[in-house]
Amino acid sequence: MYKRAEYQIIKNRLEEPRKFIQVVMGARQIGKSTVVKQVLKDLDLPYLFYSADNVPASNTAWVSDCWEAVRSLKRSNNWESAILVIDEIQKVSNWSEVVKKEWDDDTFNDRNIKVLLLGSSRVRLEKGLSESLAGRFEEIRMGHWSYVEMRDCFGWSLDQYIFYGGYPGAAPLVGDEDRFQQYIQSSIIDATINKDILMDTPIGKPALLRQTFELGAAYSGELLSLNKMLGSLQDAGNTSTLSGYLNLLAESGLLCGLQKYSIDMARRRASIPKLQVYNNALKTVYSPMPFNQAVLDRKSWGRIFESGVGAYLVSQAFVHRFDVFYWRERNDEVDFILRKKNSLVAIEAKGNAEKRTEGLDKFRELFKPTSSFIVGDGGIKAEEFMSMDLMKLF
């Protein structure tokens, strides 16, 4: 069975002496539970695995019950150590306070119980971790599957990855467009919006949240002002509502609005967002063209290609903790600006020969980036770019 790079990280951490709670976070359907189960199977240590996915949010005692179960088994079996794994931990109200209490109790009583928590709501996880568990945890971030992973595991071509994105559960369905679209809609979009966002956050207009996502996904890779979005949506309220919904969609690993790169933070925040899905399947599920037609249509493929490069970048940015922007000044534009500490990287994604790239020269002149290049037509081959270690660019 294919093992992602995170397999070794998680395995190494669980083999170390008990010191930190390990927290695995990432979007739905990217294989968090699968990789953890692979590790548990290969480790010669007893464990208990629980999921809070269908536990009532108010049932805070549930977390303590899980802990008591592993303590009881450890005592009765004379285990030297045990592992407690809780999936979708953020579903339970005040989970972080309960985890802190139980973890500290184990520490005080010298109980060697290692703890691994998984979750798909980044903000709720990080809020709980920073509020109650500071100094007690380590994060392991998992992104969407890369081109290299989809190629090695499923034998995909680059064009397939650009169009179908990187959801491993959808890979066997790409031969049947209807089944593929149904999987993306029900297992990812519906599940994330209904089970993660709407259950976790009071939303005044749930239908508007879904419309915002659908419009944003269809326009992924393009600039679209919030006012223009308001004009396209029914019962849309105001721009601050839309901005809040975009933030929620970003926190769930579905869709974000990239800000314009500027040294002035106020100008950055006031900029028109460039909409970007975290996985290109979320864009192409709304495409009127099937894969074999889209790949031959130069104009459509150019937009799909740019969105595919962007999806790869924002997913990697979450894992490796760098920022992604776009840049535009009058007629000059650069698709993606990456920033980590004081290093800037400018990237132009060129899916067809017609696209202008003068913006890259202008950006070089103004901001002196560490590196700048074209991906695709007339630059680095897309396959080569999608296979490289992005951290070496900085």
What is the meaning of each model-derived region?
Residues 1-15:
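N-terminal pre-Walker A segment at the start of P-loop NTPase domains
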Residues 24:
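Hydrophobic anchor at the beta1->P-loop junction of P-loop NTPases
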Residues 32:
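Conserved lysine of the Walker
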Residues 35, 39:
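Hydrophobic positions on the alpha1 helix immediately C-terminal to the Walker A/P-loop
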Residues 50-79:
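Short glycine-rich substrate-engagement loop in P-loop NTPases that contacts/grips substrate
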Residues 96-117:
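Conserved catalytic/switch belt of AAA+ P-loop NTPases
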Residues 123-138, 154-155:
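Short regulatory helix/loop adjacent to the ATP-binding pocket of P-loop NTPases
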Residues 177, 181-341:
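Accessory nucleic acid-recognition modules appended to NTPase machines
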